From Swiss-Prot:
Organism field: Mycobacterium bovis (strain ATCC BAA-935 / AF2122/97)
Pathway assigned in UniProt: Isoprenoid biosynthesis; isopentenyl diphosphate biosynthesis via DXP pathway; isopentenyl diphosphate from 1-deoxy-D-xylulose 5-phosphate: step 2/6
GO BP: isopentenyl diphosphate biosynthetic process, methylerythritol 4-phosphate pathway
Keyword terms: Isoprene biosynthesis, Nucleotidyltransferase, Transferase
EC number: 2.7.7.60
GO molecular function: 2-C-methyl-D-erythritol 4-phosphate cytidylyltransferase activity
Record protein name field: 2-C-methyl-D-erythritol 4-phosphate cytidylyltransferase
Length: 231
């Protein structure tokens, strides 16, 4: 495969505790059938053939362990107290290097993401879109509710999508979004990177996601992932 011009860097924020999964270690370090989630996520990015460099942000006390697991496959940095801070710290690593053309941000918990999905996001970036997210249509009916549990309405499902990762951006747009967004609202207000782009008025394009790019968050998700990798 001949790689096109313009470097692509993938950031994997993996500094969270993963308390909902309750497996006794940070979620990214949980071994799924003999291989950690972070390892599977990084391998999926590299196997796509469109990612040049991977930067992984982990808890400060796990950096040595991450280096042992990933070896030369990724740069390791200490993450922050929340996802937004963690991505910011990973972006800071890029400031000392030649700026890549594109940056992907990918959840370690989406460890089974097919390489073809990664390539699809990068292809859309190279086609001229500045921000790209993979999505899936919703199958469940969604209700908007208030703090007391009273239903306020039923959004039209046809216009809703479930968002996955990797999310891709031109480097300049992502840096501007983080610089501006981090000043305007608390980091916890942003649940994904595209939200920061939306906040500064940027346009986000969707591409087809993949059911295998589901996020391993609960024990049920873990059982599904185990069944998939064991065939």
């Amino acid at each position: 495969m001949v790689r096109e011009a313009g470097e692509v860097v993938a950031i994997v924020p993996a500094a969270g505790s993963g308390e909902r999964l309750a497996v006794g270690v940070p979620k990214a370090f949980y071994q799924l059938d003999g291989q950690t989630l972070i390892e599977r996520a990084v391998d999926g990015l590299l196997d796509s053939g469109v990612v040049d460099t991977v930067v992984v942000a982990v808890p400060a006390d796990r950096t040595d362990e991450a280096r042992q697991i990933l070896g030369h496959r990724a740069m390791i940095v200490a993450g922050g107290s929340n996802r937004t801070d963690t991505v910011n710290l990973a972006l800071a690593v890029l400031s000392g290097t030649a700026e890549p053309e594109f940056v992907l941000v990918h959840d370690a918990a989406r460890a089974l993401t097919p390489p073809a999905l990664v390539a699809r996001v990068v292809e859309a970036l190279r086609d001229g879109y500045a921000a790209v997210v993979p999505v899936l249509p919703l199958s469940d009916t969604i209700k908007a509710v208030d703090a007391n549990g009273v239903v306020l309405g039923t959004p039209e499902r046809a216009g809703l999508r479930a968002v996955q990762t990797p999310q891709g951006f031109t480097t300049d747009l992502l840096l501007r979004s983080y610089q501006r967004g981090s000043l305007d609202l608390p980091a916890a207000e942003y649940t994904d990177d595209a939200s920061l782009v939306e906040h500064i008025g940027g346009q986000v394009q969707v591409v087809d996601g993949d059911p295998l790019a589901f996020k391993i968050t609960t024990k049920l998700d873990l059982l599904l992932a185990q069944a998939i990798v064991r065939g």
